[in-house]
């Protein structure tokens, strides 16, 4: 049973949107869900990791790069999406610094299905280490549909510290869109936790420059 009601999410979302209206920034603020865990020992308990696709794209400006074969490079070019060929990847020569720079430049990668197995061989473990191993796309898939899917997907991953944050939307969204994203993100997170709600110390939502609003 969810301990966060739609009504409480709504009132917090209203305040976030009102705050961002009053203080307009020259960029679109992201809305983030910040989670504080309790009764969890990252050394002993299983470190969870899970991804979920939200109903509304939380980060429309995400920088995405296609690692493609000829067919997908062509599709990317037509759509004005950044892309790299196998030859481009070979030029990086597994240089750790260059791969790291590539991983920093983009928020996510999509690779042609036929290339996915070659990525570690071409680039080494750099993309995996950055948590940005590419999502596969087949020739039958709609490339733009895939890009939207990647932009809609958020990842909860517990590392060594008991707090984590994920983007659940932005201030240009409607109230309903933000509420839908936040509710789904919260309930999915709880499903990943060993003791569910008993592991949640706090849930806070805030826009990039706005005040934090406590949900739980």
Curated annotation (Swiss-Prot):
PTM-bearing positions, type Phosphoserine: 11
This protein's record includes keyword Disulfide bond: no
Major location category of this protein: cytoplasm
Alphabetical GO biological process terms: cytoplasmic translation
UniProt xrefs under CDD domains: Ribosomal_L1
Function: Component of the ribosome, a large ribonucleoprotein complex responsible for the synthesis of proteins in the cell. The small ribosomal subunit (SSU) binds messenger RNAs (mRNAs) and translates the encoded message by selecting cognate aminoacyl-transfer RNA (tRNA) molecules. The large subunit (LSU) contains the ribosomal catalytic site termed the peptidyl transferase center (PTC), which catalyzes the formation of peptide bonds, thereby polymerizing the amino acids delivered by tRNAs into a polypeptide chain.
Keyword Ribonucleoprotein in record: yes
Name of the protein in its database record: Large ribosomal subunit protein uL1B
Gene Ontology CC, one term: cytosolic large ribosomal subunit
Gene3D superfamilies in alphabetical order: 3.30.190.20, 3.40.50.790
Keywords of this entry: Cytoplasm, Phosphoprotein, Ribonucleoprotein, Ribosomal protein
Quaternary organization: Component of the large ribosomal subunit (LSU). Mature yeast ribosomes consist of a small (40S) and a large (60S) subunit. The 40S small subunit contains 1 molecule of ribosomal RNA (18S rRNA) and at least 33 different proteins. The large 60S subunit contains 3 rRNA molecules (25S, 5.8S and 5S rRNA) and at least 46 different proteins. uL1 forms part of the L1 stalk.
Domain of life where this protein originates: Eukaryota
């Amino acid at each position: 049973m969810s301990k966060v009601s739609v009504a409480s999410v709504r009132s917090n979302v209203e305040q976030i949107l009102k705050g961002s209206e009053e203080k307009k920034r020259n960029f679109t603020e992201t809305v983030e869900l910040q989670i504080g865990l309790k009764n969890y020992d990252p050394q002993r308990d299983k470190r969870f990791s899970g991804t979920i696709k939200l109903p509304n794209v939380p980060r429309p400006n995400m920088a995405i790069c296609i690692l493609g074969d000829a067919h997908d490079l062509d599709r990317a070019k037509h759509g004005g999406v950044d892309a790299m060929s196998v030859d481009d990847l070979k030029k990086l020569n597994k240089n750790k610094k260059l791969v790291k720079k590539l991983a920093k430049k983009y928020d996510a990668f999509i690779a042609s299905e036929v290339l996915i197995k070659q990525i570690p061989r071409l680039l080494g473990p750099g993309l995996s280490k950055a948590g940005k191993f590419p999502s596969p796309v087949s020739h039958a898939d709609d490339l733009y549909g895939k890009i939207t899917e990647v932009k809609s997907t958020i990842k909860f991953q517990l590392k060594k510290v008991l707090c984590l944050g994920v983007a659940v939307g932005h201030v240009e969204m409607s109230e309903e869109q933000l509420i839908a994203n936040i509710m789904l993100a919260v309930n999915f997170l709880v499903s990943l936790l060993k003791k569910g709600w008993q592991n949640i110390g706090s849930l806070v939502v805030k826009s990039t420059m706005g005040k934090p609003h406590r949900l739980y």
